[in-house]
Amino acid sequence: GKRGKGGTERSRIALLHALANIEQWAIDLAWDIVARGPRLSVRHMQSSDTDRPDMPLPRAYFADFCQMALDEAKHFTLLQQRLVDMGSFFGALPVHHGLWDSAVETREDLCARLSIIHLVHEARGLDVNPLTIEKFRAAGDARSVDSLTTIHLDEITHVSTGHRWLTYLCAVHPEQPSPVDVFRANVRRHFVGQLKGPFNAPDRH
């Protein structure tokens, strides 16, 4: 394809395909944290020497992650449609398993799952999405820009959800650890690689 500021069409298809792959994993991960939440929250509460009755997760936890699953399915559908519009399809290219590897790594610790999936991987998306959107804008691909903008705005709420429930779990734990300390400890323990900038501070906040 012809190369311009937005790269070749082939490179843009590859980028959309990679993003669709991430969204497909994200659908499963939203339902996974719904299903694992009750058992892992009990384990979280028992990780202290202090006796405290089990606190069931509030309904809002389940509502938040069910909404996230619906959002991720919408995102996958938007990206899949753009691939078809551009003469490709999801499954046409190889995919990577980084997100799923992190899910497996954090499968027994709810705070680790929230930290790594939602506050590292999804927050990283907030950093790179604007650059991706500009690449498609430079290529004159307004439909992809619209889809990617919709996805970006939803992902801001997903990072907020991860932050909200990590903060909640720290607050209800008998020892009330600092969410920042818990996050940093989980990144050191469970995340392979370095957190590299640039960071999109406005959307992260």
Give the predicted meaning of each segment.
Residues G1-H205:
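Non-heme di-metal
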